[in-house]
Amino acid sequence: MQQHYDYIIVGAGSAGCVLADRLSESGDHSVLLLEAGGSDKSIFIQMPTALSYPMNSEKYAWQFETDAEADLDGRRLHCPRGKVLGGSSSINGMVYVRGHACDFDEWEEQGAKGWNYQACLPYFRRAENWIDGEDEYRGGDGPLSTCAGNKMTLNPLYRAFIDAGKEAGYPETSDYNGYQQEGFGPMHMTVKNGVRASTSNAYLSRAKKRSNFKLIKGVVVQRILLEEKRAVGVEFELAGELRTCFAKNEVISSAGSIGSVQLLQLSGIGPKTVLEKAGVTPVHHLPGVGQNLQDHLEVYFQYHCQKPITLNGKLDWFSKGLIGAEWILTRKGLGATNHFESCAFIRSRAGLKWPNIQYHFLPAAMRYDGQAAFDGHGFQVHVGPNKPESRGRVEIVSANPSDKPKIQFNYLSTERDRQDWRDCIRLTREILAQPAMDEFRGEEIQPGINVATDAEIDQWVKENVESAYHPSCSCKMGADDDPMAVLDEECRVRGITNLRVVDSSVFPTIPNGNLNAPTIMVAERAADLILHKQPLPPQRSKVWLAPSWETQQRTGEPMR
C-alpha cells in the first residue's frame, strides 16, 4: 500500500466526497480517502422512497444516541450518521435546502470572515445541476442533480397545503432556494433520473476514475499523527491491523459533527479536562472542540384524511412490490421521490428578519420507523423551529475509538426554545384549518385537540419530539479573539498546522434548513482554499425579506 499522499481525507460523506473530487481534479495531487463504511450499491439507498431503511441500519449508519436529555424528561434521542460511501447524503431524506441568505450573513457576523451569502452563493451554484436550468440563483452544470420530484402531480394534497398557507396569510414562493425562501411552495430534492443523488454518485464517482486518487473502505481512523503540533498523517485500523499513511500537504477531517470531534479529541486536540478524563494525553488545548453542538427538532403533526388518496394505501407488501418493480424498470413513479414535494418556511413572530420554522408536507401519516401510524388514510407535516438557542457538546469517554462518544444537545433548555415550540404548534394548527384543506382534513391525530394550553403543548413536545438528524456546529469557524472557535475562516484547526476540518461541524450557527446542501457548499469553497485558488467572485443577488418583518409575523390576514 502506498504510504504517502498529498492529501488525506477522513470520511467519504457529504463533504469528503466533494473534496476527493475537487482535490484530485487537476491530476497534480495524490489524494487518499478513508471511509469506515462500505459500498452504497443497494436498492435501499439508491431508490428514493426507501429512505427510512438505510437510516435505521447498522450496516449503513452509526447508530448514535444522545445522553438523557433533562428537558425532554430524560429521553435519549436517536442520532444516526452515515457510515457508507456518501455518508449521510446516502441515508438522508434527500431534501435540498440551502438555508436562508441571512444564515450565512450570520456566519460572518459570528466571525467566519468570507462566508456571507454573497460569497457562498457562487459555490451553491457551482455544485448544482438544477433540473430547470441555470439562473441567477441556481446552478445548471454542477455535479449535484436537484429536482422537484414528481412536481406534486401524484397527489392533490401537496397543492392543498400550499393553498392553505396562502389562505393563512403567508406568501407563496416558487423557489425557496432562490430569491425568496419565506413562504409556501414546492420542495426540492437531490434526485437524478429517479435515483438518489448522493455525493458518492455525484462527486466520488468522478474521482474514482483518476489514477491519482485512492479510496479505502472499511477503515476506522484511530488518530491523527502529530509532530510538534503539525499534522503529518493518520493511523487507522484495516482488517484488524494498525496502519499508517502520511500526508505531504494536509490531513482533512470530514467525519461529521460527531466523528470529527471524536477524531480530534482522540488525537489529543480539545478541552484539556475532557481529554484527561478520557485517558488521552493532551497535545493541544482547544476548548471549543465538541462545544456549540446544535440540532433541529421536529414533530409529526398528523390528521386523518377523508379521501383514500394518501400513501397509507401503499404500505402493504404488494403495493410496495409494484412501486419497487416500476422503479427498477423505469426509475419513475412513487419509488422515484422522497414524497416531500411541498413545504414552507415561516417566521414564528414579528421582529424575526428571516424564517425560523420549516415544514415538510407528506401525504401519509407515518411513524419514525416508516410504518403506518394507524389504520386508514392520513397526512402529516414534519415541523419544528430551526434556529434554537440551546447548545450542547460531544465528548469522548475513553481513548478507545470504538467507544461511542457522549452526545448532549441540551434540547429545549431555554425559554425562547420552548416558546418557539408553542408558537409552532398553534401556527401549524391554524394553517391546516384553512378552507383549502376542508375536503381532506379529518380528525387531528396528534398532537390532538386536547393539547392546547402552554403546559399541555410543553408536555406533548417533551414526550414526542425527535431529532431531525441535523447535528452541526461542534468545530465552529470563528474569529481570532473567540476562545471557542476551533477553526479559522479557512477551516484550519487553530494551533495545529496542516490540519483542517471540513463538514457540518464547521458551521458557527445552524441554518434554517436541512444540512446536506450547505455542507456541500462548504466543501466546494474549502477545496478552493485548500488548493490556494482565488475564491469565486461574490455574487450580489437580491434576497426577499418580508417588508413588514419588524412589526408583522406574516404578510397577510388569515381567512380563518
Curated annotation (Swiss-Prot):
One annotated Gene Ontology cellular component of this protein: membrane
* EC numbers, comma separated: 1.1.99.1, 1.2.1.8
Q: Where does FAD bind?
A: 6-35
Which pathway does the protein contribute to?
A: Amine and polyamine biosynthesis; betaine biosynthesis via choline pathway; betaine aldehyde from choline (cytochrome c reductase route): step 1/1
Q: Which UniProt keywords apply?
A: FAD, Flavoprotein, NAD, Oxidoreductase
Its catalytic activity? choline + A = betaine aldehyde + AH2; betaine aldehyde + NAD(+) + H2O = glycine betaine + NADH + 2 H(+)
Gene Ontology molecular function, alphabetical: betaine-aldehyde dehydrogenase (NAD+) activity; choline dehydrogenase activity; flavin adenine dinucleotide binding
Provide a GO biological process annotation. Answer: glycine betaine biosynthetic process from choline
Transmembrane ranges, per UniProt, are none
Cofactors per UniProt? FAD
In this UniProt entry, which cysteines form S-S bonds? none
Positions annotated as active site in the UniProt record: 470
Q: Per the record's keyword annotation, is NAD included, yes or no?
A: yes
Which Pfam family, an example, fits this chain? GMC_oxred_N
Annotated function: Involved in the biosynthesis of the osmoprotectant glycine betaine. Catalyzes the oxidation of choline to betaine aldehyde and betaine aldehyde to glycine betaine at the same rate.
Please report which protein family the annotation says this sequence is part of: Belongs to the GMC oxidoreductase family.
Its name, as the record gives it, is Oxygen-dependent choline dehydrogenase
Species = Vibrio vulnificus (strain CMCP6)
